[in-house]
């Protein structure tokens, strides 16, 4: 174990009264920079990390390349290779071996990306998020054990606890660290950080650095996480709302969450085309759904349905109303699909832009002919989540991004930092 790692990014999590505390002596971020301008010599100081993100709608692999250009100094983040498969592991709740095979498929990407000489010292880890949190514990563990066997039979380094379900708050914190690191907000003192909004299939996270003492005083217990970085202490507001992801919200809007069973029942909504009769599988369960054949249809009745899902159920910190946030995952996907932003480059939107597009789509459901039949519902839910859930103002600016400096946003990079440090891995 290289001694230069003994004091870098020591990430210690302790639950005290529901609060997550992070402690470090000297952060690894002080010496990690994107070095895309520097060519990589694989034989001289290059090493790798493999992080699997097992989400509710798909499983994603991130293969990170790091370069140690000078012995004894901290490494550079050279780049990332990303791939994914659908559906997510939770869809294989009753076929765990088949679920593990999807991970095996993605492991081939890592083999193709990493030189054989580096396999044995490259760690591989899978962290599952809300999709597996929603499953019965025994079934979730059975899935994870099958994945662990895949890892053990691979040529890569398999650390203890290589396969686990990640706490939602941890997910939000690591995403905030990743985005603020990639945007350069954590490289020096006195710079303003940005908040992060992550919308997955089963859960959603909000994380930001409060600037007002009032926010700290009024925040509910368990929503604050303290940690040290750059010899400064940060106290983040962070919370993960399980069941408020985009696809879980569809079930709530349809009334499927309260239903005793799904067989023979068609769930209907004003957010869907009147003529629609279809089926949808989520979390391994098949749902029949359709439009209101006789009832209302369009934005106003749809918005009333989705507002009931979030209203009064999320904490609304006043401070965020005028703050800037980075938003990704389904925020990005739905904005790109409806041409609110460029699919490759992303863009900046106001919260009200989601509502404008929702009205446009929902009030033209009769002419709907292609794309997702849930588009009206999804856009309306995103609008309600931002406005009625979190309490953002119409004019709040959101930076929608999938990548920063060609690196995927989300929690995976932050988690890989922690993984490599905890194992003491350098070149």
Swiss-Prot record:
GO molecular function: ADP phosphatase activity; CDP phosphatase activity; GDP phosphatase activity; IDP phosphatase activity; UDP phosphatase activity
Source organism of this protein record: Rattus norvegicus (Rat)
Pathway linked to the protein: Protein modification; protein glycosylation
Keywords assigned: Calcium, Disulfide bond, Endoplasmic reticulum, Glycoprotein, Hydrolase, Magnesium, Secreted, Signal
Record: glycosylation sites: 231
Compartments where found: Endoplasmic reticulum; Secreted
Protein name: Ectonucleoside triphosphate diphosphohydrolase 5
Assembly mode: Monomer; active form. Homodimer; disulfide-linked. Homodimers are enzymatically inactive.
EC identifiers of the protein: 3.6.1.6
Chain's gene name: Entpd5
Cofactor requirement: Ca(2+); Mg(2+)
Post-translational modification (record): N-glycosylated; high-mannose type.
């Amino acid at each position: 174990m290289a001694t230069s790692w003994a004091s870098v990014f020591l990430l210690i999590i302790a639950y005290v009264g529901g609060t997550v505390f992070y402690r470090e002596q000297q952060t690894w971020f002080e010496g990690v920079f994107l070095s895309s301008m520097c060519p990589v010599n694989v034989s001289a100081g290059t090493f790798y990390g493999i992080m699997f993100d097992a989400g509710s709608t798909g499983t994603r692999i991130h293969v990170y390349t790091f370069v140690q250009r000078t012995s004894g100094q901290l490494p550079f983040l050279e780049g990332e290779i990303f791939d994914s498969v659908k559906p997510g592991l939770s869809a294989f709740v009753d076929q765990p071996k088949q679920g593990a095979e999807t991970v095996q498929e993605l492991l081939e990407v890592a083999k193709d990306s990493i030189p054989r000489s580096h396999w044995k010292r490259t760690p591989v880890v899978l962290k599952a998020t809300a999709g597996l949190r929603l499953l019965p514990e025994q079934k979730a563990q059975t899935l994870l054990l099958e994945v662990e066997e895949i890892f053990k039979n691979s040529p890569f380094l398999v650390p203890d606890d290589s396969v686990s379900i990640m706490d939602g708050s941890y997910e939000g914190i690591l995403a905030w660290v990743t985005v603020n690191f990639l945007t350069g907000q954590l490289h020096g003192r006195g710079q303003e950080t940005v908040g992060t909004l992550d919308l997955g299939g089963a859960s959603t996270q909000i994380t930001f650095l409060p600037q007002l003492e009032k926010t700290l005083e009024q925040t509910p217990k368990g929503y604050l996480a303290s940690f040290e970085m750059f010899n400064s202490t940060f106290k983040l507001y962070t919370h993960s709302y399980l069941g408020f992801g985009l696809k879980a919200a569809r079930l709530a809007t349809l009334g499927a969450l309260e239903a005793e069973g799904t067989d023979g029942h068609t769930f209907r909504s004003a957010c869907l085309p009147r003529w629609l009769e279809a089926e949808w599988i989520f979390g391994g369960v098949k749902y029949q759904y359709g439009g209101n054949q006789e009832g209302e249809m369009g934005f106003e009745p749809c918005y009333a349905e989705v507002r009931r899902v979030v209203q009064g159920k999320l904490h609304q910190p006043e401070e965020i109303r005028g703050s800037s946030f980075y938003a990704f995952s389904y925020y990005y996907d739905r904005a790109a699909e409806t041409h609110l932003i460029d699919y490759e480059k992303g863009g900046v939107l106001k919260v009200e832009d989601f509502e404008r597009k929702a009205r446009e789509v929902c009030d033209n459901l009769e002419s709907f002919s292609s794309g997702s039949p849930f588009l009206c519902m999804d856009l309306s839910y995103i609008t309600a989540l931002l406005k009625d859930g979190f309490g953002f103002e119409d004019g709040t600016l959101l930076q929608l991004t999938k990548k920063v400096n060609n690196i995927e946003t989300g929690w995976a990079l932050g988690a890989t930092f922690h993984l490599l440090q905890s194992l003491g891995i350098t070149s």
